[in-house]
Amino acid sequence: IMNVNQMENFVKKKKINYLLHIAGLSRPMSIHDKKFIDSIDLNIIGSANVVKVCSKFKIKLIYFSTNYVYPCKNGNYKETDSLMPINNYAWSKLGGEASVQLYKNSLILRLSMTDYPFVHKKAFKGAYSSFMYNKEISKIIPYILNERGILNIGGEKREIFKFAKKFGQNKIFPIKLKKIKNFPKDSS
C-alpha cells in the first residue's frame, strides 16, 4: 500500500470492481506507540494511497477501520456519535478514515474483528467489546457491497475475557484493565 504504481499495475491486470482495504499495522496496540512512524505510513499514508488508486480506476473501496475511534467509555456507539480515539492505533485508523471520507464511492466499516479461534493466551477483564470473527465478517460483506458512508458492525457486547474463554483454543488468563495504558474500556 506504500507503492501507488505497484497497486495501479495490479488493479489494471485484475479489473477490480471492489477493493477491501484490510492492510495496515494493527497488533499489538503498543506497537503504535513504539513505531508510530510505521503507524502513520501504513494506516494513514497507505490508506490515502489506496484511495488514490480506487479513485483513479473508479473502484468501490471498503475500508476496515475500528470501533476504537469512539471514546470507548460507554459502548453502544452509533455511526453519528462523537469520535475520540483512545490510543495511537485508533488515531491512525481515524487518519485513514479521513482520506476514505473524501472518496464518495466508499464504505467505512467500524468494527472489532478478531481471528478464529481466539488465539491469545490472555484477555482483558473489565473491558467490553462487540468482537466478531473474521469469518463472520466475510459472510456479511456481500450484503453491504453497495452501501456508502460509515457502518458500525459488531456482535454481541461481551466482556473480552468471557468471550476469549468461550471461543479460545487455549487456557485464557485474565489481564486487569488498569494494567494497560489507554486500552478501550467499552468499544461495543
Language-model region placement:
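Active-site Tyr-X1-5-Lys
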Residues: 84-112
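SDR active-site strand-loop-helix element
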Residues: 19-23, 61-67, 109-111
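Alpha-helical substrate-binding/gating segment
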Residues: 111-118, 128-158
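Conserved Rossmann-fold NAD(P)-dependent oxidoreductase catalytic core, especially the SDR/UDP-sugar
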Residues: 48-84
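NAD(P)H-binding glycine-rich loop region in Rossmannoid oxidoreductase-like domains
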Residues: 3-42
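Short alpha-helix in the Rossmann-fold core of NAD(P)-dependent oxidoreductases
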Residues: 40-47, 62, 92-93
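Mid/C-terminal beta-alpha module of Rossmann-like enzyme folds, strongest
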Residues: 140-183
